[in-house]
């Protein structure tokens, strides 16, 4: 892989304010691994590259922006929780004010600063400003893509890439990966055919592109194409299993097909062999939510989980007071409820309530009162056997849950929760809710074995008449 030096970045119309060729190449190496979702051992992994990058030029603004940005976009910590990170962001901003940076670099620094404050929409505006003038700025494209994902801004996630896609000609490094990034936004906005076509194009150029594999997995999931999905994951596994940052999530998609089929043993085997080990090795947020989401789905299906929640709890417990993403919070709560840890549950809910009272410019804390807290409360009520209360909490906000971010497939766990609650509620006010929700689900995703199972169960207790 030929990494770009100072001159190469300049030639690309993306000059970097450093005289160190080494720093420029390490910036490229870090960016490449981020885009590929893979820590490349031959490059020393992202961590290795970042520490060498800091050594090569400690005041390199774009080096600091990618370094701080990656930590923040990981959503495993924040400036409120980590003093070193807070200092690193502050130092980055101060250094940028003493240097003569290009307007593009200055915007990058400001965007990371905004993201650090929890103001994701403003950060995205700044990244978009960069992309208008520099459509091949991959860092702005990827950071904004991730932030839109956290915001549940699905159209923006798609259109952000549509606006720059024509500029990514085959001679530009990483150009095929832009197809995969674009395909994901298309898929999340229900352009399934177009999404699949682009993802397959990307895979024909670079078969190890785990994010494009991930788009195809989503398309099969959303269309309930279980057989095709399973075949695709089996055939492509050799290509994506070494993408250490996304392999666990692709295995999660594989397991979703098995849960859909009702093949719970096979799903648990994937959980035990791939998802849990990945969680224990990395502790990254994506691996955490994959574990919690999968166990919760199996639990709703009545599958005995043994001590699996207790194994996840030590990882989620550390993040009880984080409140970085409401989507993450809801999944941490699943773990403390599943492990019957009342103290952690209470702590998560009380500290989230506190955060919602003085949100400042933090978009997640602003959303906590109307969406995050009712959603978390609904999980608690479900655990306490109060299905009517679950419906009272979730029905008014069900079309707002998208605002907590995540994908349609990931948030489907909350649709399933609502249906399960509706099937066991006793209030006459709610008597036809289960039927309505099941009809809607069947219309949107026909031939889903999971939906068919739920309809059979509902019909057996006369809820479908």
From Swiss-Prot:
Keyword Transferase: no
Keyword Repeat: yes
CDD domains linked: StaR_like (cd05804)
TPR repeats: 104-137, 176-209, 248-281
Transmembrane stretches, start-end: none
Keywords, in A-Z order: Repeat, TPR repeat
PANTHER family hit by this protein: TETRATRICOPEPTIDE REPEAT PROTEIN 38 (PTHR16263:SF4)
Similarity field: Belongs to the TTC38 family.
Protein name: Tetratricopeptide repeat protein 38
Lineage, top ranks: Eukaryota, Metazoa, Chordata, Craniata, Vertebrata
